[in-house]
């Protein structure tokens, strides 16, 4: 039995890589598309047009096709990016008039796009009822909406939540038990016994944050000279002792299954899901029990889809946000072309019923709630440029 080579997944969380090719069948060249949009823009309402800048999954026919049927004649375009900052830079570079929706990881809306007036708030009367039906991590009666979906003052709703998941590291539980991996956490990779027995999934931005966890301090602060030096030594050791480094999660999952490695650095439910779906349940995303960020040693991500501050915003943008709340569309987003993730709407019986036992096992539903509870949100790293330069040097010069 071999693992399907689903190449579309390879750059899903590789925030530092350059934007790659666009999804087959829905692909278009960004520069030419931008030119066409500017040429076609009028002062009238764009009822028959919608342009979406997103992570892969939302740009698939499983998601877009039903929306086209619901809004006959709509000119619907979706471009997938491979890192959040590059997508934000499109808006900064003058493409506010191009895009209607932007789909990014949780920290960017309130920390950058909202202060820079790149997005506008959602109608709370329309969208809060949908949020109130989500899993408790994203809405509960006591605390309300997850703060990453709100403006810093808590008054404005900045986007809708859907896909999410823990993201720390992955092990073969036939070689390293789940209990051992959760107990040891990221320092597991510094054990001399693991030399040449692990891989590194080269998702650079995640690697930088996870190296901070490995070194024993939070990524989400400006670091002291002593911490920077410890980061350097930790990065050097990680790369020097790794058996393989690859941006291809399928290759790393295959190495786990074949016994070439016992675990890989940076990964989670998302990267393990396709292997698990094909029957390799020993491939498991791990969320450590403890760590340096308020006692937590694991991380998670979720996406927020926001309305762009387009001066001629399409009214179909808000319609799309509501459309993807439908149970069948929630399922399509969750399992779009091999991109296997849980979605926040799975608290609803009608959505949950769409998932088979095999699919629930693929996304590690059995432990998802507890793993999310001990995971910290992905956030902006203040001195990311410095740490990334050290990281890149350690990777380049590994011996």
Regions found by a protein language model. Give the residues of each.
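Early extracytoplasmic/lumenal segment of secretory-pathway proteins
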Residues: 39-112
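N-terminal export leaders
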Residues: 10-29
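N-terminal secretory signal peptides
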Residues: 1-14, 35-38
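Ligand-binding "clamshell"
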Residues: 113-122, 154-156, 274-290
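Conserved C-terminal helix/tail region of periplasmic/extracytoplasmic solute-binding proteins
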Residues: 365-399
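Mature extracytoplasmic/periplasmic domains
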Residues: 303-371
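Ligand-binding pocket segment of bilobal, Venus flytrap-like solute-binding proteins
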Residues: 199-203, 207-211, 219-287
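A structural signal for short loop-to-beta-strand junctions that line the ligand-binding cleft
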Residues: 97-102, 120-170, 197
